[in-house]
Amino acid sequence: MRLLGPLQVRRADGSLIHPREWRTGKTVDLLRLLATRSGEAVSVDEILEALWPNVDEHRGRGSLRNALGQLRKLLGQTAIERQRDGLVLRDAWVDTAALLKLADEARRHARHGRLALAVNVAREAEALHLGEFRAHDPDALWAVPIRENLEARFREMVLDAAEYAVELGWMRDALELGHRALDADTTSERAYRVLMSGFAGLGETERALRTYERCRAVLAEELGIDPSAQSRSLHLEILTSEHHEPPVAPFTGRDRELSTLLTWCAQRRATGTPGVVYLSGPDGSGRTRLVHEAARSLGAEVEVVE
């Protein structure tokens, strides 16, 4: 069940529910409300207050029964169960819950110094965030705190991951995450600093400096303030160097892959048999760094062929 961006709901058999199958917007919003609390009961009183706030209780309960019947018809009779005086959505994968779980996971990795894993988890979460959480009724007050919490958690995770990517020297990841963070908040100095560091780290000094000028202009126009001392310091650092390249960070988060690669190389060396190993992954995932770390451990040199 995807609630972020356009609604997508699949039945247990994998078939997609077509938008025309939803009878009313209230039916869809009932599902959205239950899905955001997947596995937890939502009281009938809370549902009535959220979806039928200006309707007397008798009519509201009748509308709820109709919407519930429609949902069970579409999803299956056991998909939504009564629990005391509430309703609970059972056995459903929901993107909002998955996103919050990934945000918690990324935070745990970072807390224990596993920055590479934190970045990878954030990139996984990016694929889930296809848009904001919205109710069918654009004025629905119940959806506001849910949307604000999801967006705040996502922005924080992406910004943190962007900064970790800079520390790791994963500049292309840093740029992609920084742009994503800036799309969510055009006044985020943290995002601008990530982009400045990313461009400078790739030797694109002019783009780094232009990013600072854009930051300065946006802050002045939108907030009436100047860039912070931290942003000004980074700007000066880039100005006074040919290109900004942070020190090489410790190699973390790839211990298992490095061990596997070294074991494979040792076996080839012991038997005297040549071989080829392929490392697959998206740009900026750390493949080149992994090869260099393996070569350093083996006392070998790496030749890059474009």
Please give the residue ranges for each predicted region.
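A short acidic, leucine-rich amphipathic alpha-helix
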Residues: 46-48
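Short, hydrophobic-biased segments on the C-terminal half of alpha helices
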Residues: 65-72, 292
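Gly/Thr-rich phosphate-binding loop signature of adenosyl cofactor/nucleotide-binding cores
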Residues: 9, 31
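Intrinsically disordered, charged and Pro/Gly-enriched terminal/linker segments
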Residues: 16-27, 33-40, 52-62, 66, ...
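Phosphate-binding P-loop
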Residues: 266-274
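Hydrophobic anchor at the beta1->P-loop junction of P-loop NTPases
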Residues: 279
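P-loop NTPase Walker A phosphate-binding motif
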Residues: 282-306
